Amino acid sequence: MNGSKDLPEPYDYDLIIIGGGSGGLAAAKEAAKYDKKVMVLDFVTPTPLGTRWGLGGTCVNVGCIPKKLMHQAALLGQALRDSRNYGWNVEETVKHDWERMTEAVQNHIGSLNWGYRVALREKKVTYENAYGEFVGPHRIKATNNKGKEKIYSAERFLIATGERPRYLGIPGDKEYCISSDDLFSLPYCPGKTLVVGASYVALECAGFLAGIGLDVTVMVRSILLRGFDQDMANKIGEHMQEHGIKFIRQFVPIKVEQIEAGTPGRLRVIAKSTDSDQTIEGEYNTVLLAIGRDACTRKIGLENVGVKINEKTGKIPVTEEEQTNVPYIYAIGDILEGKLELTPVAIQAGRLLAQRLYGGSTVKCDYENVPTTVFTPLEYGSCGLSEEKAVEKFGEENVEVYHSYFWPLEWTIPSRDNNKCYAKVVCNIKDNERVVGFHVLGPNAGEVTQGFAAALKCGLTKDQLDSTIGIHPVCAEVFTTLSVTKRSGGNILQTGCUG
């Protein structure tokens, strides 16, 4: 008997990953530890303006990394102003150089892109700068930027394609507007800017653009920071407004026209009210769209292998083990239905998936109590449930909210932003006042939130917070002295850093 004819054809790879972002790269490197043959396909479709970038995905190239660096540029401007009150004779004529900042940011990103390629090579992961598209069971077509096609087969596939910014679908949006994909490498200062949207991307970009001295307006359709705690969102909006950012509420653009070409040029934006027939128009140098993001799942041949997606959102439903309805195809990151769109979540999910597939692990990604930070001028860190979600889940009578304003010591000398920083914990009364939501608005909110996130994972209660001795004088100590409940209506204003 000739057994060789009955053996299935071997696959080219054990695992092919579509998408070279944070999640895909984490999964690739982890799978390679188990001596698996792994390939990563990554391709950046240029923006309407032609912007493209290297390996690493959104976070590294057009997301968290450049955003935090530009946020830092804005904070340094504030620090320069504060420094005069501390005895530094800073000349009044300090100016910001956009080109110098973007060059420095892009140089750093370039070094990260190179580092990822080196890491893949060292781990013997095959990387191709090519667009992946399923063509049949266990088979994928890879098309490079010259249009050359190759077919590869694999035992398993991981979809980690991420999301891209959404456009409005109005006259002039793709011709004249930019998105966050373009902003961080924009070769000229954007000048007077209209930011369209109320997402965290919109508010973060508006914040640092205003922080480096630009005239910024934010056009909002309805509420700020949908999905986040609305009490915190409104406090962020108020602070931004007090610091010179203008808000146009309940309006949406219906047309963008070019008045004059240039770098930047001049644009006319016509907008319509969401609750009447009123239209308004304004003139800006740059229009930045930040109205949301869409999953990159519709043009990768999922219909050729039977992977189900949510037709409305493009998101992929998966099991607790990130498995799609097709057993050999998995998905992680921003494209998952009902999961958090955060880089560290994708990284964790990618690593754990590889460990389950190849290392005998049974540990699944925990999507509960994930900390996050919005890097607005006044940073907002949170972990767990918003106040609204807690009330919805446990009932208003079973939720106790402890809160307080606070004033960072460093801000008392320049006498700025008194009673703007705010701390809040949301507790479940029925469960020994377990802390189910943690919220802080203030400097270094991400650094503050990270440690408390570990405590929430361990089942932190209000009693445990109260019995913790604070570090003095720091912002985070406010969480060890919260005594006023929201329902009491008691005074939460602070007169100094020591309460």
Curated annotation (Swiss-Prot):
Reduces disulfideprotein thioredoxin (Trx) to its dithiol-containing form. Homodimeric flavoprotein involved in the regulation of cellular redox reactions, growth and differentiation. Contains a selenocysteine residue at the C-terminal active site that is essential for catalysis. Also has reductase activity on hydrogen peroxide (H2O2). This is Thioredoxin reductase 1, cytoplasmic. Keywords: Cytoplasm, Disulfide bond, FAD, Flavoprotein, NADP, Oxidoreductase, Phosphoprotein, Redox-active center, Selenocysteine, Ubl conjugation. The modification Phosphotyrosine is found at residue 131. Binds 1 FAD per subunit. The thioredoxin reductase active site is a redox-active disulfide bond. The selenocysteine residue is also essential for catalytic activity. The gene is TXNRD1. Its main location: cytoplasm. PROSITE patterns: PYRIDINE_REDOX_1 (PS00076).
